[in-house]
């Protein structure tokens, strides 16, 4: 009881105060003006809407996806909306060499990098797991491993700019979902890896923020086609979702929750979890870890 009064209650008070004040921090579109941003999976859906919002805010944008023709249309529209500059590089994230080279090319086009928004996924269908290991491997490579490759390639530039990494994930990466086992596994992997890297940045004073975006069902054409007649759930608008993703990255938030289940942030993003994480980090002797 004495330990709780002396340590835990004051710490909990500090965390509650942090959440209260950080929740009231205001986003301003000019935060993105002139910023150099990469958006993956930007030929349609959420990624395309992210690119359009960034363009309206006056950012430099480099987009990527597999479809060259669609990317050309996205870039043309970004320029009409007011982007400081807009470029595309077409390719597949199944190719890790492309992923690594893409970041270098994008950095040269913009003269640096301030924000890396990782949004791409491979196609996923609702079905019971049928022991298809090839499908699991593809989901993990595209939805997870390519994110790691892109991040490793981008970190030198992001460290120079004190930039941000924004990882678009899913509620399926916080709560296991049936019918999408490989997809869910890849999203859990994103949470585990990037949350760990965020803590490593805190321990080593690396000023590169990592924002994990936990999304519910969003009304993209692909998602609506897949869930039609299978899942009775209201979808949230992709345009607003894209804006919330940008806001979270600009405000350097640890996590962003977006969807029509309003209770999700209260249950999954609670200050008690943060307190436990904080106390856990205090156990690490960073000087010995760095020397090793």
Swiss-Prot record:
Gene source species: Oryctolagus cuniculus
Catalytic activity: an 11beta-hydroxysteroid + NADP(+) = an 11-oxosteroid + NADPH + H(+); corticosterone + NADP(+) = 11-dehydrocorticosterone + NADPH + H(+); cortisone + NADPH + H(+) = cortisol + NADP(+); a 7beta-hydroxysteroid + NADP(+) = a 7-oxosteroid + NADPH + H(+)
GO biological process: steroid catabolic process
UniProt-annotated location(s): Endoplasmic reticulum membrane; Microsome membrane
Membrane-topology descriptor: Single-pass type II membrane protein
Sites where the protein binds NADP(+): 41-67, 92-93, 119-121, 183-187, 218-222
Residues given in the record as substrate binding sites: 170
Name the record gives this protein: 11-beta-hydroxysteroid dehydrogenase 1
Topological domains, Lumenal: 25-292
Known tissue expression: Expressed in the eye.
Segments on the Cytoplasmic side according to the record's topology features: 2-7
Cited InterPro entries: 11-beta-HSD (IPR051253), NAD(P)-bd_dom_sf (IPR036291), Sc_DH/Rdtase_CS (IPR020904), SDR_fam (IPR002347)
């Amino acid at each position: 009881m004495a330990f709780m009064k002396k340590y835990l209650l004051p710490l909990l008070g500090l965390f509650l105060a942090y959440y209260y004040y950080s929740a009231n921090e205001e986003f301003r579109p000019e935060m993105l003006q002139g910023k150099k941003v990469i958006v993956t999976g930007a030929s349609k859906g959420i990624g395309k809407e992210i690119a359009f919002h960034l363009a309206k805010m006056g950012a430099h944008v480099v987009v990527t996806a597999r479809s060259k023709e669609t990317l050309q249309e996205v870039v043309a529209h970004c320029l009409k909306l007011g982007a400081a500059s807009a470029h595309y590089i077409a390719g597949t994230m199944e190719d890790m060499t492309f992923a690594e080279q893409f970041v270098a090319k994008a950095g040269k086009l913009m003269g640096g990098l301030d924000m890396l928004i990782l949004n791409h996924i491979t196609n996923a269908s609702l079905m019971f797991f049928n022991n298809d290991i090839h499908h699991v491997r593809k989901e993990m490579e595209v939805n997870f491993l390519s994110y790691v490759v892109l991040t490793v390639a981008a970190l030198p530039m992001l460290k120079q700019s004190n930039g941000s990494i924004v990882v678009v994930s899913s509620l399926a990466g916080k709560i296991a979902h049936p019918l999408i086992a490989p997809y869910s596994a890849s999203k859990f992997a994103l949470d585990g890896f990037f949350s760990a890297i965020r803590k490593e940045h805190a321990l080593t004073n690396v000023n590169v923020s990592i924002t994990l975006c936990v999304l519910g069902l969003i009304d993209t054409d692909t998602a609506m086609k897949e869930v039609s007649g299978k899942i009775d759930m209201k979808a949230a608008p992709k345009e607003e979702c894209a804006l919330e993703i940008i806001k979270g990255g600009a405000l350097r938030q640890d996590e962003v929750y977006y969807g029509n289940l309003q209770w999700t942030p209260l249950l999954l993003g609670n200050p008690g979890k943060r307190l436990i994480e904080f106390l856990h980090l205090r156990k690490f002797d960073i000087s010995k870890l760095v020397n090793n």
